[in-house]
Amino acid sequence: MKGFTDLVDTLKLQLSGDDVPDVTQVNQGYGSLGQLVGAGLLTPLDDAATAQDWAGRQGESLLAVNGRFSPDGKTMGSGDLYAVADRGAWVGLFMNAAKAAELGIAGPPTTVDELVAQMETAKAGGVTPFMFGASDGGEQIWLMADLLMADTSPQVLTDVINGTSEQLPPEMLDVANTMQDWAEAGYFTEGWAALTSTDVLGMFAEGDGLFTLNGSWNVFQSDTPENFRLVPFPLGSASELAAIATGDLPWAVPSKAKNPDLAKKYIDFITGPEASSIWIKNGQVPASVSGNEAQEVEANGLVGVSADAILQWANLVTNGTTEPFPDWATPTWYDTIAKSSTALMAGEITPEQFVEALQADYGPFTAERKASS
């Protein structure tokens, strides 16, 4: 099995060869898209984006998250546009609304304090508060990012991922304390360290637990879809609507493509209104927003988390902030956060040691990237 670095190297070889596709999908972040841009292997798409008003479809924030880089591949989130997603992908709080009603909980939490209070209510009622699985790393990475936004602001998370500073914000220690406190309080699934986020989502779909954290790409089918909700993680302020919200693997045009104009037309179509309606009809989240999502969701009979995935996405793109996945900050941060956070929540390391481990990965990479740009 090839590792991520091997896959990036393979794509580099493919795009630098003689038999190059006109369009290709790429991974976002410094470890993939940044390397391809820096190697001069992709064509900027700004001319098509301007002519077809792609920012009007997806919002400039989302375009920047998925595909903007400086030409040297060293600065993410600004510069030329090199890739555009056709489908949306965002991380939110799944809630068993039926179980919440049984516990006397009126609706989704709007602050972290409300979330904690609702988890306490669930625990007292014999319900697992938070279905949590850590063995694949994703859920604790998402939780860390959401807690950081709630403790500070979405802009702080943006700055961390883009590497604005070589030092992590001091509030990261508060986040670490919260993660450890929740584990020690017994909010998480029994045996959480050995379970994946997919494992616990399946258990949640069967009726276990009050909450879980997962992505819109994992919307599940249920015999009682009206019993479940999917909402953004509570940040505590109506003006702070934000979530980890990017796209499926975005489309890019190789520099050596033989038909670059045709390739751009394909990207324009696959992100346009006709394709978006097809995505919704199939229960998927289109990256582009039309303003007609509510009518299309109703017309296609989507309810519960299937409807929420699309409608909440449209609201995020239109009225909120779309944040990159935090592990995009360095090529190795996913593994660093996953391993260190598991040790943190298991009580094997202190919050201070957790932050030190993240900084030891983040600081040198960010400094080297800045020095070479």
Which role does the model predict for each range below?
Residues 119-121, 161-192, 224:
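Glycine-centered hinge/linker elements that transmit conformational signals in sensory
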Residues 46-61, 134, 151-174, 235-244, ...:
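Short, solvent-exposed loop/beta-turn-alpha elements that line the ligand-binding surface or hinge
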Residues 72-86, 91, 116-164, 200, ...:
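Extracytoplasmic/periplasmic solute-binding protein
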Residues 2-10, 112-116, 191-205:
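Short helix-initiation/N-cap motifs at beta->coil->alpha
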Residues 185, 223-286, 339, 349:
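Extracytoplasmic/periplasmic substrate-recognition and gating elements
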Residues 1-39, 51, 107, 237-239, ...:
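Conserved N-terminal structural module of periplasmic/extracytoplasmic solute-binding proteins
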Residues 31-90:
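Hinge/lid segment of periplasmic solute-binding proteins
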Residues 160-161, 307-362:
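C-terminal capping/gating helix-and-loop segments adjacent to ligand/active sites or protein-protein/ligand interfaces
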